[in-house]
A protein has these predicted regions:
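C-terminal helical subdomain
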Residues: 177, 184, 203-239, 246-248
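Residue(s) in the substrate-gating loop at a strand-loop-helix junction
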Residues: 144
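Amphipathic alpha-helical dimer-interface segment in Rossmann-like NAD(P)H-dependent oxidoreductases
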Residues: 115-133, 172-173, 177, 233
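Active-site-adjacent segment of SDR/Rossmann-fold oxidoreductases
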Residues: 29, 149, 158, 170-180, ...
C-alpha cells in the first residue's frame, strides 16, 4: 500500500526533469497522475513510464500553461478521467536565459510571470473546489533558491519564482481553514535548465556540483520526488505555508556561481 493510494495528482511540466521525477515519486506511492506537458513526445513518454514502472494510472494532457483555457482543461481532465483531484504540482517553466536587469525586456519579464505566476494562479483557482472536498487537498509549487538569494542576471526567473512563493503563502493562509495545504519546494536538482547550463558550460556545471555541501546535484526522482510525495500525503496535513529547500544544503551558503552575460 502506498501513501497516496486513491489520490489523483496533476503535475505541470511533467515531461522531463524535476516534474518527471515528482510525477514518478507520486505514482510510486500509488497516485494517479495527469501529466501536463507542452512537449507531446516528452509527456507521452512520461505517462507510459509511469504505467510501465509502477502500474500507475496516468494520462497525458498537452498543456501550454501560459494559455488559461488549456490550464482549466488540464484541471478538468483530472476529474473527467479519474473522478477527483487531490494534489496540484505547479512546476512548468521555460525561461529566456540570463540577462542583465537593464537588458531585460518587458515582454520577457511578462512571459516569466505568465509561465510561473499566472499559470499557478489559474490552476489553483480552478482546482480549489476539488481540493477542499476531502481534506486531502495539496498544492506544491516549485520555486528557487536563485530567487530567494537574488541570483545575478536572472531577473525574469527570480522575480517570477518569488512572486509564486508569495502566492503560495497567501493561499496557505486563506485556505488553511479548508484544510488545503500549500507549500513550496526550492529544489537543487538536475532540471532541464541545469541540463542546458551543463551542455553549454560543463565547467560551470561541475563547479555548481562541487559548491554543493553534498558535492552533487540532486536527482529529480530520488531526491526531490520523495519530498513532494511527503507534502502530497497525510503526514503533511499540519504543514502549510512553508518553503522547503531540497538542495543538499546549498541554501546554507547561497548561490555560489554566476553565469556569463554580455
Amino acid at each position: 500500500m502506498g501513501t497516496l493510494d486513491g489520490r489523483v495528482a496533476v503535475v505541470t511540466g511533467a515531461g522531463m526533469g524535476i516534474g518527471r521525477g515528482i510525477a514518478g515519486a507520486l505514482a510510486r506511492e500509488g497516485a494517479s497522475v495527469v501529466v501536463a506537458e507542452i512537449d507531446e513526445a516528452a509527456g507521452t513518454d512520461t505517462a507510459q513510464w509511469l504505467r510501465d514502472e509502477w502500474g500507475a494510472q496516468a494520462e497525458f494532457v498537452r498543456t501550454d500553461v501560459t494559455d488559461k483555457e488549456q490550464v482549466l482543461a488540464m484541471v478538468d481532465a483530472a476529474t473527467d478521467r479519474f473522478g477527483r483531484l487531490d494534489i496540484l504540482v505547479n512546476n512548468a517553466w521555460r525561461g529566456s536565459g540570463f540577462a542583465r536587469l537593464e537588458n531585460m525586456t518587458d515582454e520577457k519579464l511578462r512571459a516569466g510571470f505568465d509561465m510561473a505566476v499566472m499559470a499557478a494562479f489559474w490552476a489553483m483557482q480552478a482546482a480549489l473546489p476539488e481540493l477542499e472536498k476531502r481534506g486531502t487537498g495539496r498544492v506544491i509549487n516549485l520555486c528557487s533558491l536563485n530567487g530567494v538569494n537574488a541570483h545575478m542576471y536572472s531577473v525574469q526567473y527570480n522575480a517570477a519564482k518569488e512572486a509564486l512563493r508569495t502566492l503560495t503563502r497567501t493561499a496557505a493562509r486563506e485556505w488553511a481553514p479548508r484544510q488545503v495545504c500549500c507549500n513550496v519546494i526550492c529544489p537543487g536538482a538536475q532540471s532541464e535548465a541545469y541540463r542546458r547550463v551543463a551542455e553549454a558550460d560543463p565547467e560551470m556545471a561541475a563547479g555548481m556540483a562541487a559548491a554543493n555541501p553534498m558535492g552533487r546535484v540532486g536527482d529529480p526522482l530520488e531526491d526531490i520526488g520523495p519530498v513532494a510525495a511527503f507534502l502530497a500525503g497525510d503526514a503533511s496535513r499540519y504543514l502549510t505555508g512553508n518553503t522547503l529547500f531540497v538542495d543538499g544544503g546549498a541554501h546554507i551558503n547561497g548561490v555560489q556561481w554566476a553565469p556569463s552575460v554580455d
